[in-house]
From Swiss-Prot:
One of its GO terms (molecular function) is (E)-caffeate-CoA ligase activity. It is an enzyme of class 6 (ligase). This is 4-coumarate--CoA ligase 5. It catalyses: (E)-ferulate + ATP + CoA = (E)-feruloyl-CoA + AMP + diphosphate; (E)-4-coumarate + ATP + CoA = (E)-4-coumaroyl-CoA + AMP + diphosphate; (E)-sinapate + ATP + CoA = (E)-sinapoyl-CoA + AMP + diphosphate; (E)-caffeate + ATP + CoA = (E)-caffeoyl-CoA + AMP + diphosphate. InterPro entries: AMP-bd_C (IPR025110), AMP-bd_C_sf (IPR045851), AMP-binding_CS (IPR020845), AMP-dep_synth/lig_dom (IPR000873), ANL_N_sf (IPR042099). Induction: Induced by heat stress. Induced by wounding. Down-regulated by UV irradiation. Keywords: ATP-binding, Ligase, Magnesium, Nucleotide-binding, Phenylpropanoid metabolism. Pfam families: AMP-binding, AMP-binding_C.
Length: 539
């Protein structure tokens, strides 16, 4: 990507702040430990067990010492294959203390999906629950650590936590260059890639939201934050766990989403901050249990990962009249938050329906013409680009993909089409990127297409999103069957379902004579999406 004149660059309405980006992530999170050592930090939603900030600090030191004893050191990679849990948070902070990198994975992924990420990330330790040990037990060169009651032929998380926390090795962390987190993302296109988020990057991104005299996301020490979104997703890891801990709030950790149990936890613990995604809001709004619980404690509902329509916003306002509702906008590669609703600021300002906030502090944003690369003025849609210390270092072992995403002037190209209005609010209107968003989860068409084409009965295939009221988008496939194969749509669905996690499964198959392609061979997805919009019948 070349260098072009930058005529139109947008910044936050809020002034830049001093960010202690010289600190490693764990030191930044615990920087104010002396003032909140005895305050509640993590609350286990299932048991009610509460760990104070002092408890979490000490436990993360002990687990770090335990990880060190099994070979984890500066530059090692640890995979967390866990549902939401206190152990997840502690293991992440423990790895940070050692200068190790944490890669997170959905425990519902299939063994082949997990094996690919272990190999690609170079993970040598996997921390998981006994229920998921079988998914990783056959991986060569990997030490498996089991939480809970432990498991045969595995190290025990409890054993790690019994180590001497004062015996930690001295580690020289390069905050600008050492990655601390390695989530996997499909970026704007293609197969999942490891996103290298540095200590400095995550410290900057958290500070952009919750630090300063007038934080954009005003979390208080007396707040109780609901953590129902999966921590293996960067939205939850960053905006709930790290932002919550930095602000000194208590975090109620819910292992998995269940509407009734979630409402019970909100009432029981007086939850004040509810970060959600639209599919959860839909389920909550539909639930008969909603009116049986006192949810008046909620003062803020933060929506992310997928757009929230006006109709859904109206439902939230009706059901939770005390809550301020707003949206943020993020992308894993952006560190992850690009913009946040100003209604969440300590000194809030009015926001428009459909907006996803204003650009975060200490960062620059521009809108560029996808064809010319020139920056555009207000109210003109183009590709959203972001620049700042918070963005990723790059994709692990993939300089080509990195160069396609971050240009030589440091601008990260999101693949999202949007505009900035006269009040600095950002609106997303379309996507250049090919990703399918199923309930906020990323589904890369290329991954499913490679699977389909590998089937002996499939000559060609293309995967595109279809709009869905409850899921946002669902993956559907256009398939060219080989002559005489006689393959059915159910056979194709089952073939894919055996290899992928639930949200990547194909929902519909459309048999066609040919896949529309450009002379370059690129699939013309717009043509296929147009067929869906026109109501093509399922085959």
């Amino acid at each position: 990507m070349g260098s072009l004149p930058e005529q139109f660059v947008f910044r936050s309405r809020l002034p830049d702040i001093a960010i202690p980006d010289h600190l490693p992530l764990h030191d930044y999170v615990f920087e104010r430990l002396a003032d909140r050592r005895d305050r509640a930090c993590l609350i286990d939603g299932a048991t009610g067990e509460t760990l104070s900030f002092g408890d979490v600090d000490a436990l993360s030191r002990r687990v770090a010492a335990g990880l060190s004893s099994i070979g984890v050191c500066h530059g090692s990679t640890v995979m967390l294959l866990l549902p939401n849990s206190v152990e997840f948070a502690v293991a992440f902070l423990a790895s940070s203390r050692l200068g190790a990198v944490t890669t997170t994975a959905n425990p519902l992924h299939t063994p082949p999906e997990i094996a690919k990420q272990v190999a690609a990330s170079g993970a040598t330790v996997v921390v998981t629950e006994p229920a998921f040990v079988a998914k990783v037990s056959g991986l060569a060169g990997v030490t498996v650590v089991a939480t809970g009651g432990g498991a045969e032929r595995c190290a025990s998380f409890a054993g790690l936590a019994a180590a001497d926390g004062s015996a930690l090795p001295e580690v020289a962390i390069d905050v600008a260059n050492d990655a601390v987190a390695l989530p996997y993302s499909s970026g704007t296109t293609g197969l999942p890639k490891g996103v290298m988020l540095s200590h400095r990057g995550l410290v900057t991104s958290v500070a952009q939201l919750v630090d300063g005299e007038n934080p954009n996301l005003h979390l208080r020490e007396d707040d109780v934050v609901l953590c129902v979104l999966p921590m293996f997703h960067v939205y939850s890891l960053h905006s709930i766990l790290l932002c919550g801990m930095r602000a000194g709030a208590a975090i109620v950790v819910m292992k998995r989403f269940d509407t009734v149990k979630m409402l019970q936890l909100v009432e029981r613990h007086g939850v004040t901050i509810a970060p959600l995604v639209p599919p959860i809001v839909v389920e909550m709004a539909k639930s008969d249990a909603l009116d049986r619980h006192d949810l008046s404690s909620i003062r803020m509902v933060i929506s992310g990962a997928a757009p929230m329509g006006k109709e859904l916003q109206d439902i939230v306002h009706a059901k939770l009249p005390n809550a301020v509702l707003g949206q943020g906008y993020g992308m894993t590669e952006a560190g992850p938050v690009l913009s946040m609703c100003m209604a969440f600021a300590k000194e809030p300002t009015p926001v428009k329906s459909g907006a996803c906030g204003t650009v975060v502090r200490n960062a620059e944003l521009k809108i560029v013409d996808p064809d010319t690369g020139l920056s555009l003025p207000r109210n003109q849609p183009g590709e959203i680009c972001i620049r700042g210390k918070q963005i990723m270092k790059g994709y692990l072992n993939n300089p080509e993909a990195t160069e396609k995403t971050i240009d030589k002037d440091g601008w990260l190209h999101t693949g999202d089409i949007g505009f900035v209005d006269d009040d600095d609010e950002i609106f997303i209107v379309d996507r250049l990127k090919e990703l399918i968003k199923y309930k906020g989860f990323q589904v890369a068409p290329a991954e499913l297409e490679a699977m389909l084409i590998a089937h002996a009965a499939v000559a060609d295939a293309a995967v595109v999103p279809m709009k869905d009221d409850s899921c946002g988008e669902i993956p559907v496939a256009f398939v060219v069957a080989r002559d005489g194969s006689g393959i059915t749509d159910d056979e194709i669905k089952q073939y894919v379902a055996k290899q992928v996690v639930f949200y990547k499964r194909l929902h519909k198959i459309f048999f066609v004579d040919a896949i529309p392609k450009a002379p370059s061979g690129k699939i013309l997805r717009k043509d296929l999406r147009a067929k869906l919009a026109a109501g093509i019948p399922a085959c």
